[in-house]
């Protein structure tokens, strides 16, 4: 009887996906609409994601243009951006919000690279926890022959190693992007 790895695979993939989402919100030196993904605007009394109350475009390399679908949301959009931890200063002409992405300093790049490493480490810990859970469930299988247990443990370890390598690749790609001027 072979051990089913689908749950472990999907949970490890979930850790990778969470890392990808987390890294898209880290701003580099270029304008990227995804840095605004976590910003929510109070719109008619409810907290609503910014991309549902406005269109976000990138007209230039370091400029984000936010065009509200409803002009009454303009002030709330500005307030939400100011309250976020992005460190961006929105400017408005009454119809649109313009965000200038400042050139990053060397120190800022290094700090963000450290943040990338920390997020990658969280993802690795998550993958290792999935491995531990899978190993525990293999050991709890009473009717499983010892050879099958050993094979399942090896398969789980290979899956873990592959996911850790993928996480390292994702993190190093983001670090390279950050440290490139």
UniProtKB/Swiss-Prot annotation:
Family: Belongs to the RRF family.
Coiled coil regions in record: none
SUPFAM superfamilies noted in UniProt: Ribosome recycling factor, RRF (SSF55194)
Protein biosynthesis is among the record's keywords: yes
NCBIfam families (alphabetical): frr (TIGR00496)
Keywords noted in UniProt: Cytoplasm, Protein biosynthesis
One of the Pfam families matching this protein, by short name: RRF
The name this protein goes by in its record: Ribosome-recycling factor
BP GO annotations: translational termination
Function noted in UniProt: Responsible for the release of ribosomes from messenger RNA at the termination of protein biosynthesis. May increase the efficiency of translation by recycling ribosomes from one round of translation to another.
InterPro entries reported for this sequence: Ribosome_recyc_fac, Ribosome_recyc_fac_dom, RRF_sf
Subcellular location as annotated: Cytoplasm
Sequence segments annotated as region (Disordered): 131-154
Single annotated GO MF: ribosomal large subunit binding
GO cellular component: cytoplasm
Gene3D superfamilies tied to this protein: 3.30.1360.40, Ribosome-recycling factor
Biological classification of the source: Bacteria, Bacillati, Bacillota, Bacilli, Lactobacillales
């Amino acid at each position: 009887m072979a051990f089913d790895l689908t749950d472990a695979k999907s949970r490890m993939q979930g850790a990778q996906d969470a890392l990808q989402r987390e890294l898209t919100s880290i701003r580099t030196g270029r304008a990227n609409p995804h840095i605004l993904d976590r910003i929510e605007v109070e719109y008619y009394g409810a907290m609503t994601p910014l991309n549902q109350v406005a269109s976000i475009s990138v007209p230039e390399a370091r400029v984000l243009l936010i065009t509200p679908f409803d002009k009454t949301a303009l002030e709330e959009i500005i307030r939400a951006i100011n309250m976020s931890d992005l460190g961006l200063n929105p400017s408005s002409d009454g119809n649109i919000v313009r965000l200038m992405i400042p050139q990053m300093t060397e120190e800022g790049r290094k700090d963000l690279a450290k943040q990338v490493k920390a997020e990658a480490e969280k993802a690795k810990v998550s993958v290792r926890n999935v491995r531990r859970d899978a190993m525990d469930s293999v050991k709890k299988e009473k009717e499983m022959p010892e050879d099958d247990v050993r094979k399942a443990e090896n398969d789980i370890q290979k899956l873990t190693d592959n996911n850790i390598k993928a996480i390292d690749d994702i993190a190093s790609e983001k670090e390279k992007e950050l440290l490139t001027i």
